[in-house]
């Protein structure tokens, strides 16, 4: 397996916390500590524009499939709804008073899940953009959301080190799982739905059987916090991004380490914490505290 840096998108003046690919091919959105959400062209790797200004740092961006909108979760607790057809912000979802850390949508139910530092997840109708439910998960932050491929269950990662599994039909708690010794920052179900991968401040990847949520494997994956775990859309691999400035690519079936992308390994990589990843085909995109977006071309053997 090889990894080659093919582009670097520069222009952000502050750390970048998150990114989201558009439903339109070759368009990327990024956000962080800057005063706006940025749109990029991945065909020629150029800056397009600042989509709209924001009053607080952007921690989460989400484009629900089939809806012409982009949701932006802010440090202030506000979620801005940008409409691509009208080319403007049409609504601000005002419920949370503390930072928004993750936003995901449930296609079958046409619902939106928003996780906050206030320890709750709010549930919204995608059709009306009205809140329909609130789940109190923890006394502390809910950092991340993962929805099972069959959309029957949802996992929430919390700062209290726990992972909470809920039934997506009626939002009842199915199981609370404990294994991490520190805050859980990222969760991802395998594309076939057989297991859940978790990572966080303790730098471990834990693999959980998604039928009974028992631990299958523990991988001492990074030197510092794992900020993101992301499965390749079609190939049996997943990538991890860490505060240790490295990206690692693992086998999704054998859990072997196949590639390390870091300066230590001779790659022109990030010089500060890597916060989020996105797969665009076999290209891996990464954003960092170092203010840059890097595009890696991954050749799988």
Residues covered by each model-derived region:
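WD40-repeat beta-propellers
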Residues: 37-40, 79-82, 121-124, 163-166, ...
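Residue-level detector of Asp-centered blade-edge/turn motifs that repeat once per structural unit
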Residues: 23-24, 65-66, 107-108, 149-150, ...
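WD40/WD-repeat beta-propeller blade N-cap
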Residues: 9-16, 52-58, 94-100, 136-142, ...
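Blade-level signature of beta-propeller repeat domains, shared across WD40, Kelch, NHL, RCC1
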Residues: 273-301
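Conserved strand-to-loop turn within each blade of WD40 beta-propeller repeats
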Residues: 31-34, 73-76, 115-118, 156-160, ...
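Short loop/turn segments that connect beta-strands within beta-propeller blades
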Residues: 42-44, 84-87, 126-129, 168-171, ...
